[in-house]
Amino acid sequence: MTKPIIRDPIYRRRRFDAEIIELCVRWYITYRLSYRDLAAMMVERGIVVSHTTILRWVNRYVPEFEKRWNRYARPVNTSWRVDETYIKIQGKWNFLYRAVNKYGKTVDFLLRPDRGIAAAQAFFRKALATSLPRWPRKITLDGHKQSHLALRLLRREDPRWKFVQVRSSQYLNNLIEQDHRAIKRRCASMCGFKSFRSAAVTLSGIELSHRIRKGQFSFGRGRYGNSGSLKQLWERALA
């Protein structure tokens, strides 16, 4: 008797195979392709899928894929470089807060509609939650006053922030400004974001792909470890 194929529950009631869904999502967040490009590429493989279906796959599965990859995330260094970059949504500028360590590895990111004190505080809290139990030793900022004030206010909430050295250096922050370029290049090939939620999900996928390229995940020292093609690494992460 043939054994039934065990299907990942996240693909339950989906008409397309999991392999097709994963391929489209992976290619979209990794390469400079539009949804229509991917739909045309699938047709060449004999698979008819609309570009709107691929869009729904990205919005549905990127958060789950990110969660599964994060099980294998390497810890990052405790010296942060923090900066914001502009992202256009519905014709208006929004702000993507990002932090990398001194080696250029991504610490965390957060999309916000504004650039105020509350936005900066929200980012620092999120980045800290990602890094715990390790606290940052140093945080390097640009000259944006709200970010400095946000850290001063956080010190009043939690005295442990007082042990974090805060620096302001445009030279040291060149590292993260260079790192922004990979994200901006991918966004430039899109026709703009139509909603804040869609932008947040898509950007988290782009950031995930960027972290994979930077070698920020480890699958241990087993038979295969971190070797293999990008496809094989994805298969291990999603298993």
PLM-predicted stretches and their roles:
Residues S34-I47:
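DNA-recognition alpha helix
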Residues G143-E207, R211:
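Helix-centered, glycine/charged polyanion-binding patches within enzymatic domains
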